[in-house]
C-alpha cells in the first residue's frame, strides 16, 4: 500500500514509537506531537491508519493540543496480522491507562466501537468524538457474512457467536453499541455524512438518541473517509473540544 501524498506531512511532523503492548503480542506504532495543551487520542477505523486524521491533527497540534495516534494491530505500520474488536478494545484501554489521562478521544468508523467499549470497561474521557460511526449491532454483521454463502443466517450466526465466545471469553453481542450506549454519559460529538455508503447515517442518529449527552452534526458530499480531511469538520471538532 502506498501512502497518499497528502498524508506524507503527517509522518514528517510526528514522533514515532513502536511499543510492545501488554494487551497483545504485537508491536504497535504510536505517533506523537507533544504540546502543552489538552491530550487527545486518535483511533482510526477498520482498514484505516492514523495518517488519515492528518487534517484534524494538524489543526489541533497547531493550536496547542498534545496528540497521540495509534495504528491498530494489523493496520498502518503496526504488526501486520489479523485483529479483532476485543483486542482493539483492550489496546485502547491500555493506552488510555499507560499514556493518559486524555481529555478527548477522536475516532473514525469502527474505531468508535472500540473506544465506546473501552469506556464501557472503565476508560474515561472528558470528550468523545465519533466520526462516521460504522457499527451499532454486532449480530447483523455475522448474519450478512453467513448470508453471502447462502447458509441459514440465524443458525450459523449463532454458531459463530458460540465460537467467538469460546475464543475470547465474551459474547460478540456484548460489544454491540445497542447493548450499552444509553449508559454512556460522556459529552460526545457525532459527525456523519448523509450520503455515506459504508456506514448508514441511521447509526449516528440512533446513537444520538441513545446517548445522554450528544451533539449530532450531519454533513453532505463527504462520504465515509473524505470527511476526515474536510477543513470545516476539523474546525467543528476543535471547537467541540
What are these regions (language model features)?
Residues 1-20:
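An N-terminal hydrophobic leader/cap segment in hydrolases
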Residues 50, 57-79:
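Conserved alpha/beta-hydrolase
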Residues 56, 177, 186, 200-209:
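Short alpha-helix in the alpha/beta-hydrolase fold that links the catalytic acid
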Residues 82-103:
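Alpha/beta-hydrolase active-site loop
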Residues 106-115:
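Gly/Ala-rich beta-loop-alpha elbow adjacent to hydrolase catalytic centers
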Residues 123-170:
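Hydrolase active-site cap/lid region
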Residues 183-185, 190-192, 196:
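Short beta-strand/loop motif that positions the catalytic acidic residue
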Residues 222-232:
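Catalytic histidine-centered segment of alpha/beta-hydrolase-like enzymes
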